[in-house]
Structure formats: structure tokens, C-alpha cells
A protein has these predicted regions:
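Short glycine-/aliphatic-rich beta-strand segments at the starts of folded cytosolic domains
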Residues: 1-12
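C-terminal structural segments of small proteins and small subunits
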Residues: 48-72
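Short beta-strand-to-loop capping motifs
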Residues: 10-12, 46-51
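Short acidic amphipathic segments
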Residues: 25, 31-37
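Short amphipathic alpha-helix segments
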Residues: 11-28
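Secondary-structure boundary/capping signal
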Residues: 16, 32-33, 53
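Surface-exposed aromatic
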Residues: 39-44
Length: 72
């Protein structure tokens, strides 16, 4: 199966939010790489993964009070 790339605009505010995401994403072994651009006003989250949907990512982020919206 081929890697998928998802890009989200988020409500990430700081490095503490990024630490929370790191802890969360350790529960998802199909997420291979991810990064956040804190310099961008939309706080872009980019994820490379297998066998996970954008809805799965959105739901997971909501559990740690991070709002996200997929960009197309």
C-alpha cells in the first residue's frame, strides 16, 4: 500500500501542543512521519501515513483538544 499524505490547518498554539500530538501519534504506528509549521498562521500539520483516514486523524486530535480541518 502506498503512503498517503494529509495536510491540516490546526489550532495548535505552542510546543506543548506538539508534545501532546507526539504522545498521541505514538498510538498510531501507521503514521510514519509528521510535522507542524508553527510559523504558518494556519499552523499546518502534515502527516505521512498508511491505512488511516483524515477522519481518524481529526477524531484523534479532538481527544487532546486540537481542532483541525483537512486542506485539499
Amino acid at each position: 500500500m502506498q503512503n498517503q499524505i494529509f495536510i491540516f490547518r490546526t489550532s495548535i498554539k505552542n510546543k506543548q501542543d506538539i508534545k501532546s500530538i507526539k504522545t498521541l501519534f505514538t498510538q498510531y504506528p501507521t503514521i510514519h512521519k509528521w510535522n507542524v509549521d508553527l510559523e504558518d498562521w494556519e499552523k499546518i500539520l502534515r502527516i505521512e501515513c498508511l491505512e488511516i483516514t483524515p477522519i481518524d486523524v481529526l477524531n484523534a486530535l479532538q481527544t487532546i483538544n486540537i481542532y483541525a480541518e483537512e486542506l485539499e
